[in-house]
Amino acid sequence: MLPTRHRMTKSSEFRQTVKRGVRTTHADLVIHLRRGCPDSACEQVEGPKVGLIVGKSVGGAVVRHRVSRRLRHAAAELLPKLEPVDRMVIRALPSSSTALSASLRQQLRDGIDRSARRQEPAAERQR
């Protein structure tokens, strides 16, 4: 499971990550990843934080909670790939309710890799 200290809880963190992070779109997920942190928050870094957005379009309460559990578990496995100052928001699309856990995990892994590559400076990308 995703440890509490790695869960995004403040609406301001969600807003900043979605607004300023790099978005990658997949079949069942939309991932917003923000590398680094605003100057005021750098002192209190406790590790990467992950937030979930699972709307009613995904399904009823039982389905939404099942999708949330799958995404939290997949995110917990991928925490070592993130820097301590990273913030990630995962938005579940309606098709995520029927997706396999392995598929969600792979989409999440691909999203992190693509977002990280897009945020690298151009000089480092060409190496």
Curated annotation (Swiss-Prot):
It catalyses: Endonucleolytic cleavage of RNA, removing 5'-extranucleotides from tRNA precursor. Residues 107-127 have a biased composition (Basic and acidic residues). One of its GO terms (biological process) is tRNA 5'-leader removal. Residues 99-127 are annotated as: Disordered. Its EC number is 3.1.26.5. The keyword Amino-acid biosynthesis does not apply. It is an enzyme of class 3 (hydrolase). GO terms for cellular component: ribonuclease P complex. GO terms for molecular function: 3'-tRNA processing endoribonuclease activity; ribonuclease P activity; tRNA binding. Belongs to the RnpA family. RNaseP catalyzes the removal of the 5'-leader sequence from pre-tRNA to produce the mature 5'-terminus. It can also cleave other RNA substrates such as 4.5S RNA. The protein component plays an auxiliary but essential role in vivo by binding to the 5'-leader sequence and broadening the substrate specificity of the ribozyme. Consists of a catalytic RNA component (M1 or rnpB) and a protein subunit. This is Ribonuclease P protein component. It comes from Mycobacteroides abscessus (strain ATCC 19977 / DSM 44196 / CCUG 20993 / CIP 104536 / JCM 13569 / NCTC 13031 / TMC 1543 / L948).
